[in-house]
Amino acid sequence: MATKKAGGSTRNGRDSEAKRLGVKRFGGESVLAGSIIVRQRGTKFHAGNNVGMGRDHTLFATADGKVKFEVKGEKSRKYVSIVTE
């Protein structure tokens, strides 16, 4: 008769699914209105001209144009804008 001691149990083995956050359209890229530019938690990037912010802080284009990233203000905040042609 084969004998094998019971393995016991573990309290590890869980991990959450990746949320696919980050910049989706980079500086200089052309976008259409409604395109997602940045998926983020909190406001790492702020909405500039022609950019809207969703309730989960997702930044999206509100007009067609090119993406522009810039650092502005006293607090050196990062803004994302859309420059229309």
From Swiss-Prot:
Gene Ontology process terms (BP): translation
GO molecular function, a single term: structural constituent of ribosome
InterPro entries the record matches: Ribosomal_bL27 (IPR001684), Ribosomal_bL27_CS (IPR018261)
Keyword Ribosomal protein among UniProt keywords: yes
Start and end residues of each stretch annotated as Disordered: 1-20
Keyword annotations of the record: Ribonucleoprotein, Ribosomal protein
Family the UniProt entry places it in: Belongs to the bacterial ribosomal protein bL27 family.
Name of protein: Large ribosomal subunit protein bL27
Gene behind the chain: rpmA
